Amino acid sequence: MVLRIRRIKKLAPLIFTSLLSLIVLFRVYRQYPFSDHFETRREDDRSGNVHCFSRLRQIEEYEKPELTSKFYEPNRWKSFISYVTRSRKDVKTVSRSLSNLDLYQKCSKEIRADQDISLLHSIETKLFPYINFTALNSEQSHNFWPVHTRFDGTKYRGQVLQFSSENNSFIGTSPIEFKASEPFWENWLNSALQRNSKGVVMSVSEYLVADTIRLIRVLRLLNNSLPIEIVHKSDLHESSQQLLIAAARESGSLNYPPQELWFLDVKDMLNDEYLARFKRFSNKWLAITFCSFQIPIFLDSDTVPFVPLDTLYEIDGFKRTGTLFFKDRSFPTSKLSPLQVKVLKQIINNSLDVSSDSEQGFEILKHNLNDEMAIDAIEALIFKKQKHYMDSGLVIFDKQKHFFCLPIAIMLQFSPIQEFFHGDKEWFWLSLFISKKEFTFYPIEASNVGRLEKPETLESSTICSTQLSHTDVYGNLLWLNGGLSVCKKNCWNYDFTKRKEIAAKYKSVDELRNYYQSPVKLEAVIIPDVSKSPWSQQSECVMYSYCTHYRKGQYGKLIEFTDSQKKYYEKVVELWNKVV
């Protein structure tokens, strides 16, 4: 035994030296520097010693690999070496990409000669590899443009849709006048969108058709007057489009006005090799970026509004910042890892040239943000390590004010740090923050809406549901995420067979299915006090059910709906649950 311990002691230095040698060899092979203090191009650009186009030429000529914003594949299985080197590599990669995008944007505003725009066009193919620039620059460039299809079957390619500023009715089209003397994104913003246009946009593929039909029915009930545009990548069948048109235009009731429905196919704008990378959540970027409206309201298919959407444009926060975001459920136990927080801090520090770790640096950040809700988001990220902050089921975004944040968000969504957050959500506001742009969140916390469970005492209440709700300052429902059935997922077989506590409550799979597919009952809302009684996850609906709790005078806020509110909400619930 003593001899074995001695052998291990002798081998330990050898093992350590071997591992260290492997790390050194790996870094040499990958051309990583040994002294890595995360200097970025942004610092060089700010020095004023080099004109931005000279810097772009230098990067384009000598550092082409650093210029390309390729899409990264998530790597769930990481070797020891990649674990050791990853954080530094991720900071350098993302900081470099952000710096290159910033440099491109600055140069876009300083074009002085033909060679400048030629260089920018060359750089664009590397910074935005998902755009089909080959088609745009070919003799058949007309085929690059997305195809608009109106509900009546009329198709337009290479046209700008025009809507009345008085009643949002369709009044015609005008040709897109793309100028070779302008950068791509500036061209798109100035020539492919009607100035000050507003509308509803959704990203829809086949599996979202049923929920989208339900959403359109609700929009009709709300007397929606905004045009609706459904964005897809040629992955929405003609038969499905006809079902959506019927939902938007059928004359079953004079009280429900027909909708100005459009379809936008953006497939030809995208490089084939990147087409499949835009799936699920990431399709939102295509919808918001390429939709026909300057100021779109983006909706998830399972979002349900309870107020006319055009009234949201009147919210003070949106009018002040050009954005309106809503908060997600707050989970104290769902945290970013210390390494993830460190990486994000370093990227923020590099991008904004300020230390978010120091008290003075954070005070500078707060002063620059100048918005309590935005400051709260940053504090939640940096100090509370909060992984979930934004619910992106409804987003309002003024592209005239903040357009270039969209390509930045796309880069972040597909960067090496894409796994830090769930889907698209946090990249909306982080792209604005890193770009030093204004943004805000609606000031009311996210809530749980549904049926009040029988209280243990008269002073306590609980609501358990799959719906995430958002209320105004008076307690009225603005909108919710998650549809209006008890559980929108077809998971009754799984829950019944895998969850003993669920099987004990229901006699059969059919009984559980009937319950899951039944309409919700909207009786009240509880806004939890997460510091005292946080959201709790339940086993129903494959763990998509959450409970919030209220105890009078101690924690939470209970809002019980009036009879008139309940009657109105029941009407929305009934309409949403009609057979599709």
UniProtKB/Swiss-Prot annotation:
Membrane-side (Cytoplasmic) residue stretches: 1-10
Claim: ATP-binding is one of the keywords in the record: no
Membrane topology: Single-pass type II membrane protein
Disulphides: none
Pfam families associated with the record: Mannosyl_trans3
Protein name: Probable alpha-1,3-mannosyltransferase MNT4
Keywords: Glycoprotein, Glycosyltransferase, Membrane, Signal-anchor, Transferase, Transmembrane, Transmembrane helix
GO biological process: protein O-linked glycosylation
Molecular-function GO term, any one: alpha-1,3-mannosyltransferase activity
Main localization of the protein described in the UniProt heading: membrane
Ranges facing Lumenal side: 30-580
Membrane-spanning parts: 11-29
Gene: MNT4
EC number: 2.4.1.-
Residues carrying sugar: N132, N167, N223, N349
Record's subcellular location: Membrane
